[in-house]
Swiss-Prot record:
It comes from Carboxydothermus hydrogenoformans (strain ATCC BAA-161 / DSM 6008 / Z-2901). This is Large ribosomal subunit protein uL14. CDD domains: Ribosomal_uL14. Belongs to the universal ribosomal protein uL14 family. Keywords: Ribonucleoprotein, Ribosomal protein, RNA-binding, rRNA-binding. Binds to 23S rRNA. Forms part of two intersubunit bridges in the 70S ribosome. InterPro entries: Ribosomal_uL14, Ribosomal_uL14_bac-type, Ribosomal_uL14_CS, Ribosomal_uL14_sf. GO terms for molecular function: large ribosomal subunit rRNA binding; structural constituent of ribosome. Pfam families: Ribosomal_L14. NCBIfam families: rplN_bact. GO terms for biological process: translation. The keyword Transmembrane does not apply. Part of the 50S ribosomal subunit. Forms a cluster with proteins L3 and L19. In the 70S ribosome, L14 and L19 interact and together make contacts with the 16S rRNA in bridges B5 and B8.
Length: 122
């Protein structure tokens, strides 16, 4: 459950470390984003040689949330951190590597490139 002002970790190698959600996409009054949802973020922390710079506004997809998400079979999944992957306008990741596990919900939302780069899909 990600809302405006939420700080997320970056789960890719674009050089961004911390992202802050500034908009949840999908309707004018949408408050929360969950796994597989696209958000607009501001880069709050980045490495010096980063692809993205501090202060840059980027689109990202949520890949891990602390809030548990119910699956259709009745099981729940939650992670230790909130994390997102920075994406281009065509839903492909801007980085070339993904760090940490990602949720299976991304497969249903057509983020196949992120699924294929991820070391583990839970």
């Amino acid at each position: 459950m990600i809302q405006v002002q939420t700080i997320l970790n970056s789960a890719d190698n674009t050089g961004a470390k911390k992202l802050m959600c500034i908009r949840v996409l999908g309707g004018s009054n949408r408050r929360y984003a969950s796994l597989g949802d696209i958000i607009v973020c501001s880069v709050k922390e980045a490495t010096p040689d980063a692809v993205v710079k501090k202060g840059e506004v980027v689109k990202a997809v949520v890949v891990r949330t602390k809030k548990e998400v119910r699956r259709p079979d009745g099981t729940y999944i939650k992670f230790d951190e909130n994390a997102a992957v920075i994406i281009k306008d065509d839903k492909s990741p801007r980085g070339t590597r993904i760090f940490g596990p990602v949720a299976r919900e991304l497969r249903e939302k057509d983020f196949m490139k992120i699924i294929s780069l991820a070391p583990e899909v839970l």
